[in-house]
Amino acid sequence: MEPKKPPAGVSSFAKSEGLPLKKFAGLFKYRTHVTLSRVPDGAEGLVIGDLARDAGPRDGRPSLLVVCSDGLRMQRLEAALAFFAPDVHVLALPSWDCRPYDRVSPNPVVVARRMTTLSHLASPRERRKPIVVLTTVNAAGQRLPTRATMAAETFAAAAGGRADMKALVGWLEANGFERTSTVRDTGEYATRGGILDLFAPGSETPVRLDFFGDEIEQIRRFDPETQRTTGQLKRLEWVPMSEVTLTPDVVSRFRRNYLSTFGAATREDALYQAISDGRRYAGMEHWLPLFHDKLETIFDYCEGTRIVLDPQVDDALKERLADVADHFEARRDALDDTAPGTVPYKPLEPKLLHLTAEEWASRLADAVTTRLTPFALPDDRLDVVDCEGRQGRSFAAERAATDVNVFDAAISHLGELRAASRRVLLAAWSEGALDRLKQVLEDHGLGRTRRIASWPEAGLLEKGEIGLAVLGLEQGFELEDLAVVAEQDILGDRLIRAKKRKPKGSAFLTEVAGLAEGDLVVHVDHGIGRFIGLKTIQAAGAPHDCLELVYQGGDKLYLPVENIELLTRYGSDESDAQLDKLGGVAWGARKARMKKRIREIADQLIKTAAARLLRTAPRYTPPEGLYDEFRARFPYEETD
């Protein structure tokens, strides 16, 4: 359909007081599908924040649904929005951190965040701010419990109100919470007499509910480390810790759907037996459609919301669809080869849990969409808006040159930007990195600077002042009258980033993939053994992936893959190394001798350190400017 032309007098952008980026001023009311061209990498947070403000608050409904290509881009965009758009409420829906058709469940921390977001969308709390929902291709393409289910499963309690503690504990058990002796992590609960401790999804700290009979006398926040009270609450709401609840009705529905899908269950069918008994089963979320009569997607939760697609979405979608299909085929082929007496894995058809390519196309065709691209597109197209941004200056050539000082080059560039009346931000990954960079550049004539915690504070910058901000950007960018110079533009790539959670199950797979059949390994308790391969065995009525290790005399040890940290690779490639005997004393004796030797070495080191402290020598102070430059080039994150 031909997009409508905006009325006369409506330009591509309109000026907005206090913002460097001109807002989109109702342009999208006349265009269903729009592509924003020349949006440089790193500027997405600024652009999306402005789009959200243009959409405005929608009485609790999302202003934008942003689909990122992967979890890393979603994390970076979330951090960028926190800086560029602190006035926007951000909800994130991450994808499961496990493989399609896996035997493990998603990480509870990931599930808690997903459930918190879905609950907020099903029962809106924030109505005054624009709401941006961030998600990924993997998460957007996966079916979810319905909005009605999420709204019904939200539990509320108030100080002075009445509640049946026994019924509440039953609700926690059915909704994925784990009973522990001491509550420390999200999704845990503990009871002691008339006290219920609970760490609910979406909460920063756990809470303690004091019961007197069926009355909740008080609700207190407490520190999970010290267990000391830190504050009081009048009211508390929490949501399930799992997308699968195990109420009697749900168990009955699962049994009915399972039998109609796969036929009669056998004694070896551990999934069916566990759910029938009301027990949670590792990886049961991969059969989510069997627990529900109906499922929805994030597109249903964000019905009528403009969808923003990042530049790599199309490629990520193709890869995801192929990945799901490959895992399904592998499981189906393995099912045909399942030996009698082993636990079968009966995979569901992909379309039951994941959107098909046709469904994706239909969803996007029916929605109002905005695509972002860093590339220039023909400006005669009515569906293209040119943001006229570009990537920031790279100083790679200056870093490589022996006769050029990269910091002098950076100062020269900053001077050119100020001379052009640009608003300039200098961004670094951490406070320490920003301090070092500022100090070095000041030695080269940086001029006046001001620390800013978020983008609105940039309006306080006086003429010629440079803003200093902690903002994790891979590279800087220029957009309208704003120029952001990133730490990496000047110093090059840093070698360590903030820690990222690996997909559950991928850590051990990566390690196992590095082992070949016949490799020697050392178990911390049992000594040298030989790796045979991976084997799935029955443990506590459920299948478990284990590493098969053989020891002297042919004795075998099956080590669960999640305990692979107990193994190290043997330091020599010699294949004739003597294997230890399971239960023998030789390995323990060798460890004892080694510990004794380590203590002797430690004693020598302590004596050497003491002697060094007693000696004196002239103190040399490095030239301040050169030393600061050396520190600024340090490519690693400093430890605490």
Regions found by a protein language model. Name each.
Residues 1-576, 594-595, 599-619:
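Conserved beta-alpha structural segments and adjacent helices that either
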Residues 580-639:
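Charged, low-complexity
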